[in-house]
Amino acid sequence: MATNGFRPEYEDLGRYEDILGQLPMLQVYSHIMLPFAMPEGLSRDTIIADLEAAVRQIRAHVPWMAGKVVNVGKGPDNSGRYIVVPCPPPDPLIVVRDVTHAFPPYKEIQRLKAPNSMLDSRLLAPTNAFPQRFEDSEEDPFRVIRLQASFVDGGVFLDFVTQHNMTDAGGLFGFARLVAMAMRGEQFSESLLEQVNRDRRNIIPLLTPDEPMLDHSHHIRPPITDAQPVVRPDPARWHFLRFTAAKLAELKDLASQTMTPDPEVPYITTDDAVSAFCWKKYITVRHRRRNTPDARSRFSRAMDGRKVLGIPAEYMGDLVHNVTTWLTFRELVDLPLGEIARHMRRELNRANTAYHVRSFATFIAQEPDKSTIAYGGRFNPDTDVGSSSVLRVDLFPVFGKLGRPDFIRRPNFPGIPFPSLLYFFPQNPQGDCDSLTCLTDADMEALNQDSEWTSMVEYIG
């Protein structure tokens, strides 16, 4: 019998092995960091106690989050299976650091809007991050969740970390929301636990023999190894940008006004418009250096498959598939913003379907060596852009006595750049969207000298 919504079958860790989480490229950690101002009169000890209580509540109700990930059955031409197994709890449950000596007062961090250059992962993060692979060991297990609280004068940074074979961005944000709920003193409802602990084994119906598989060959790349990572770390740096609510609306209006009528594209979204703007400007500044008008550029968008499969947002497993749009450098330079956004929305409308997700899952399931599969395939950071947007996700909940975070950030991992990657983070309560992008110095300098770019984008750093 269930107690407080918890069911005994949730303790069967075999139910959490899915298909989309089996890619070796996901043998990494994902991070999302939330900075808070310390409320008057609230002690560090109280915050630590509340965070530890929240993690205990999660571990008790979400068994797979209390485990670690291991790879079994790996061999020649076979990448093995990623499964979650029991693991003793860490002691202490969360990492706590006083980093006051290395940071200005939190009010100054607020004033500067928490630029990436300030967010040293060596101080603020408990472990490494994508695209750097993590290897499980007795000394440092590949835990499904980690949490670090880093205190500065007048503030605290909370770094939420999840194992990527077990969760996508929705699952990472779900972990943060569970902590917020627990810190508010809320119990996890039966319906929430049902989705968080949902059996993943058959959540995506694979194609039947009489259903043709779509072409996913663009996801094939050389096998991912330590010597051959997801992308070569060319000289590049991470930067935070801000699109204010007013500029987001302006970009959407501009794109809507310059779009040719298309029966396949009844509308475009703010996400389409801001993605098209970044793609156009990135390639425009590269074209000035390269002068290769016929070169093809690819914009790869990570899409959440939950909606098209009828799966609630609270489900935390990997359900990401990718939608790709191709245009030439000449087209990206010459076409108006609305036409680029129309192309992107058309490809998304065609591919963001249950059949596409089922086909992608079948493609993965049938390939013994999944190290040859990557979202970006043979990604070329000089011509392509890889993007993930969670612009519409709410990630500013109240974390009990701590209140709401001021920003959404990611610790800065300067030694592991991923050039031409672009994240759009959730909009803040004022409607502003902060974006994290990795670009070469040449790209960033050229963009900051582009008047159209600087009129739309606030550079945070």
Swiss-Prot record:
InterPro entries on file: CAT-like_dom_sf, Sec_Metabolite_Acyltrans, Tri101-like_N
Signal peptide (residue range): none
Molecular function (Gene Ontology), one example: acyltransferase activity
Tagged with keyword Methyltransferase: no
Keywords, ordered alphabetically: Acyltransferase, Transferase
Function as written in the Swiss-Prot or TrEMBL entry: O-acetyltransferase; part of the gene cluster that mediates the biosynthesis of nigerpyrone and its derivatives carbonarone A and pestalamide A. The biosynthesis pathway begins with the polyketide assembly by epaA to form phenylacetyl triketide precursor from successive condensation of two malonyl-CoA, presumably with one phenylacetyl-CoA starter unit produced by the phenylacetyl-CoA ligase epaB. For the nigerpyrone biosynthesis, the reactive polyketide chain is released as an aldehyde through the R-domain. A nonenzymatic cyclization and dehydration may create nigerpyrone.
Protein name in UniProt: O-acetyltransferase epaC
Taxonomic path: Eukaryota, Fungi, Dikarya, Ascomycota, Pezizomycotina
